[in-house]
């Protein structure tokens, strides 16, 4: 199932970096596919003695989230029941209930779905879309995370995708 793939990317990714001695100060998630890395980092901070709330703040301070999908249908969402199957023990390790963990990805308290984009945005200090228009669409799409904010002040910026041709293209191809 897709959820297991994302667990491997997120949690496994952090553990793989740690295993080879790499300890980034900032993590950048592209869309929600590796979003569970935020939960692994929360668990690490809790293991070091922080409370769950303090761990969220520590993770947030070292996280950036890029959203690529400007339509709800393109965002990974998982049934709460499936999430609970894989993360109830994880919540216990963090000294919290599964309900507290689920809230990171819920659109509202009654939602039975975990939304990876919402979790990514809640666990990031900075967020952006991949073009100016996409930033505008994303601010509208995710405005409910910042109630009371005018749409233009929702803290989702933009970085336009692109490449620097001289450093991207090989010399052989450039000579063509």
Which residues are covered by each model-predicted region?
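Catalytic cores of carbohydrate-active enzymes across secretory and cytosolic contexts
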Residues: 1-176
């Amino acid at each position: 199932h897709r959820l297991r793939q994302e667990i491997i990317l997120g949690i496994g990714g952090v553990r793989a970096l740690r295993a080879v001695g790499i300890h980034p100060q900032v993590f950048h998630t592209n869309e929600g596919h590796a979003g569970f890395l935020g939960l692994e980092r929360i668990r690490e901070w809790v293991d070091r003695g922080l409370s769950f709330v303090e761990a969220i703040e520590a993770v947030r301070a070292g996280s950036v989230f890029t959203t690529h999908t400007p339509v709800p249908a393109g965002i990974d969402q998982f049934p709460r029941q499936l999430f609970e199957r894989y993360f109830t023990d994880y919540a216990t390790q963090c000294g919290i209930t599964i309900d507290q963990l689920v809230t990171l990805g819920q659109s509202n308290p009654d939602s039975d779905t975990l939304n990876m984009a919402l979790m990514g945005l809640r666990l990031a200090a900075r967020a952006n879309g991949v073009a100016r228009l996409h930033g505008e669409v994303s601010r509208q799409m995710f405005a409910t995370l910042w109630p009371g904010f005018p749409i233009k002040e929702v803290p989702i910026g933009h970085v336009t995708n692109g490449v620097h041709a001289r450093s991207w293209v090989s010399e052989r191809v450039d000579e063509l």
